Amino acid sequence: NLYEGFMDYLSARVLGIGNGEDHLVLNSVSNLTKAYRHLDGYGKLQCHFDNDEAGRRTLETLRARYGGKVADCSGLYGGCKDLNDYLQKTLAERQAWRENEKKGKNNGIKL
């Protein structure tokens, strides 16, 4: 599992992504070439990059080097900037649901 930043890594851990697997945090996509020596031995690279131009460029750079070993995991948090944004949105939605449940506004539906 490969992340652009440490907050995305921490968010992945909270969400249960990659339990029992190795993780590598770039801290900036500009550090990608420094990470190659750590990535070369892996059979699959699950990339959790930001949904922006820099994230897409980094993904394409990895695909050029590693081909089919590279998996784009950004679909998990589509509509959000990154994993941390997705986690914050998910937590806010759960909190709103719980508050509505207390007020009886969820029509008896439970999470």
Model region roles, listed by residue range:
Residues 1-4, 47:
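Conserved Lys-Pro-Asp/Glu-containing loop-to-beta segment of HAD-superfamily phosphomonoesterases
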Residues 4-7, 51:
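Helix N-cap/beta->alpha junction signal
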Residues 14-111:
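TOPRIM fold recognition
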